[in-house]
Structure formats: C-alpha cells, structure tokens
C-alpha cells in the first residue's frame, strides 16, 4: 500500500509539471518528454482495482441454464439421441479446442468468427467452430474410412449474438455423419430422413427442407460468367435470398463484389427458382446449364435423391431451391437446410421461412485435407440447431403455462409422526439400492403436510408414508399425490409396487 501511495504522489507531481509546462508554453519536445515520463509512471501504477466496480454477469453471447431450462434441454436431447441411435450411429467426442491450423481455411468468409486462444507454451489454438472439421481430423488421424457417428457438444463463434432468437457465441450442435464409400445418394437420403424425423418428433411447427448441390451452384456460376476467384463470395451473397430481396442481393454482388450487372441478371434467372423433382428435370434440359458437366452430375444425383426421398415418404417436406448456397467452404455435393414455416395466416399469403433449425451436406474432400497422402473419405452429415429449438420449446411451454418437472423423483419417503428419521433413512436407502428414484426431507421431524406440499410442488407422484402402526404391521402406506388415494403395501412388496405404478422395468440389470 505504501509503495502504491508513493507512486500515486509521483504521478500527481508529474501531472502538475506537465500542466505547468503547457501553461508556460514550453517547447513541444520538452512537453512530449515529460508526458512520456507521466505515462510510464501511470503504467507502473496500473489500475486501482479497489475503485473498479465488478459487474457479475456471463460473457456476451452466453447464458446460464436454470433447472427448468435444463429439463427442456434434456427432453430435446433425448428425442435427438434416440433418433440417432435408431439409425445405428456410434458416439464420439473431440477436444473443445483444436490447433489453429486445423480450423483455418475450412470456413471461407466465416473464418473471422473463430475464437483464438493464447497458450502460455506458444501453441496456436482455437475453440472449435463446429463439430464437422474436428470429425474429419479424427478420421484422418485414426485412418478410419467407414463410420456412422453422432456427436453432441458445444461450439464457439465470435458472432453478434441475438439471444432472444436463439443465437449465441457458445452453443450446442447435434451432429450426425456417415463416412465411407457407398452408392450415390443413399446416405444423403437417410440424413434428410433423420432431419425430418427429429423435427416432426419435436413438434415445433411445420418445416421445409431446402436442398441444392454445390456442383449445380458452381456450374451455374460458371455458365453465367462468374470467375473462379469470385465463386465463394458470390455464394455468400446468394445465400441471403431467404432474408432479403433479389434487388438487395444483386446490389451487393454488383456494388460491393464487383460483378457485372448482366452476369448478376443471369444468376437471378436461376437462383429465384424453387420446386420439386420437376424443376430438376426441367434444368436437366436447360440448354445453358447442360453445358456444365458439374451441374449435370449434381442434377443427376438430385433426381436420384428425390426417388429415395419419395420411398422414405418425405418428398413433400423437400424443396429444390437454387438460392441455397451455404457459406462453408468444405461442401462438395448435396447441401440442405431445414427452416420453420409460418402458417399462411401468420405470413399473410404463402408460408414463409422463419429460421433455420438444421442444416448439412456432403463434404467428400475435407478428410483429404488432413491426410498426409491426401486420401479422401466421402462424408455426408447434418447438424441440428438445438439452441433455436430450445427457445421455441420454452416459449411454447410458457404460452401454455405448462409446468415442467425438473427432477425425476418417483417417491418421497415421509413420516406421519416424530422420531422416525432412522426408519426413513433405512427405507430410502432400500429404495435407492433397488433403483428407485427417491427423496426425503432433511429434517428430523418434518410435518406431514409440508412433505405432501413438497411433492405437489416438485411433481413427485408417490409418497411412501411410515408411521408407528405401519411399522408394527410390517406395511408402508403408499399415497398417490394426484388422487390422494392411500393403500397399505407390505414392505417386501413396496419396490415392485412403485415400479409397477411408475412404469419402471422390474429388473435394473
């Protein structure tokens, strides 16, 4: 403290000296020299931490989750994981941070959103931007050529968050990917089927899945006169068509990205089209587009994809949309994105997209970027945007004023008289050992009314009540919280009766 006080006095004196020199209109060189001394003293002094008010909050773009929010999240995750497992996926995990070199050059214009870490050892690190690039690195490192995997974990982006709309800097992704050499479009169709199954199961509203193909985009841009160097940057402009008008997109391409107006008009003739398999067939006959080998390959695969989607019974949920041009650099084939739709009444006329909730595509070259010999492993996958889904489900539950249980407790062990703590402890231990989710209140002599109220507030369905008479008779009084019906159950039959009432399997092995 004494040392700091001495420094503060020196800063004060030096400040007075600088002010005096300025009043005396001393030479600029002398003033500059004395100002430098003042700044040096201030740097030594550092900030006065005692005067700084610490604001207790989470970092920008992040949030805490309450027990209620976590209960909603667990339900959403459960739907997603059950679907992934139903389709035969294995689960993996990767580090939350990667070598910076691993992530750079994989995301195009979005690379600027990657979080960099300062490591004391000098290693250049970054927080993962998504789960796909780490998966490709994992495949190359382990020399894997065939796997169906899912991965649920947090990713990080230095984006400008809109937290009310489910956009954050730290958020979960739920990914499903199929790696390996297979016949065309079968894995791609399954990914779209999974996407539709999950969105239907979550019951968050009507949705539409837009599909396109990177080869069609590249072929279309080539025949329209876009140079190779502008392919990716024009893609990012076209991809905004779901949010802004064609005129605004055209102005950006011409004004900001230097595209000739006639080239932009030719692009506009294509990217404003959307439809089903009939549009695919129409474009296969397009005299200009058919000059591109890339575009023809993409259209041929999309035609086959629609055949499989019809067999899966989801073709009515899919729209071929030429404006879909997702910005990630690593996509090489089919790309897709699911959007929630407003109803015609909400939208005014036709259904409109109100936000992306899932996306994915084929990335056949990404693993080869990490393999020392450049060996490619074809991959296709999808990612569920769960943060937006959490927000939608939470809003729906609030609107319905629906109570959400935050625990899974099946039974509360209660007592009707005093001095029965030991008996409650013995019984709750028996229930835990039998795999029953049970609780008791942490009081020696709780009132029965307080115990019953706790069950109602927490949504616990059953109460196992111990009394002196019940102990003499070798029974436990089992009470239903909702119906208030009570029955005496022999102690040795209690576990079986609770499992029967709660629908829990009798064997936990």
Swiss-Prot record:
Catalysed reactions listed for this entry: tRNA(His) + L-histidine + ATP = L-histidyl-tRNA(His) + AMP + diphosphate + H(+)
Instruction: Give residue ranges for domain WHEP-TRS.
Output: 3-59
Q: Name one GO biological process term.
A: mitochondrial translation
Q: Which SUPFAM superfamilies match?
A: Class II aaRS ABD-related (SSF52954), Class II aaRS and biotin synthetases (SSF55681), S15/NS1 RNA-binding domain (SSF47060)
As recorded in UniProt, its EC number(s) are 6.1.1.21
Gene Ontology CC terms = cytoplasm; cytosol; mitochondrion
The subcellular location is: Cytoplasm
Query: Which CDD domains has this protein been placed in?
Result: HisRS-like_core (cd00773), HisRS_anticodon (cd00859), HisRS_RNA (cd00938)
Give residues where N-acetylalanine occurs. 2
Residues the record lists as Phosphoserine modifications: 66, 356
User: Residue span of the signal peptide, if any?
Assistant: none
What's in the keyword line of the UniProt record?
A: Acetylation, Aminoacyl-tRNA synthetase, ATP-binding, Cytoplasm, Ligase, Nucleotide-binding, Phosphoprotein, Protein biosynthesis
Provide the residue positions that the database annotates as binding L-histidine.
130-132, 157, 173, 177, 326, 330-331
Give the UniProt family note.
Belongs to the class-II aminoacyl-tRNA synthetase family.
**Subunit (UniProt):** Homodimer.
Report the function annotation for this chain.
Catalyzes the ATP-dependent ligation of histidine to the 3'-end of its cognate tRNA, via the formation of an aminoacyl-adenylate intermediate (His-AMP). Plays a role in axon guidance.
The entry's protein name is: Histidine--tRNA ligase, cytoplasmic
